[in-house]
Amino acid sequence: YSTTGSTDSRFAQMAREHCCKFEEIFKRYPNKTFLFEITDESDPHIVEEELGETFIGLIDAKTGAQESEFELDKIAASTAGALKRPFYKDGEQYLKTSFSELKNIVKEAKFEGFMVYIPSQNDFCFKMKTPYYLVNKFFARSKNEALSGKLDKTKLDEEFHPLIDHIKANEREFRSLDEQGKLGFIKEFLEKV
């Protein structure tokens, strides 16, 4: 078990704790590396996610080739629900839409984002993060010494200017918060707007 190359970090230990239950499945796919998004209470995400493991990839250890989303779905289906796959909403796994429509959906979404694929090739193209996620990450993970520069309105789209004004008006309080406190502060404000 590893995370970004480390086999002994606390995140690698977390992966081991979450994924050891899948070892029988792993044995069916020798020389393959399983990729998971793990959401754990001890490592809160920028936006709320369901706790647990989500199967997001499978890589051939010899060639580096990645399995298609279609193949990942087949593998997950063969595990009687043990491997959970990502979904868009209401259990719907894929959103088939145009790029221009996706840009509109992303503007309103309150989750991390989308993995975008080329349908004709079933091939991963890029990640599209939501502004909601990006602005939360931008401010919540900011060190106090970097906050002043981040409160420059030229660095964010104008729809986030009221948030900048709110943070500036409450800057002392905001600076005193830890990451989770900052996320709560931002979320509370964005829900009111």
Region roles according to the model:
Residues Y1-V193:
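Core nucleotide-handling region used for phosphoryl-transfer chemistry
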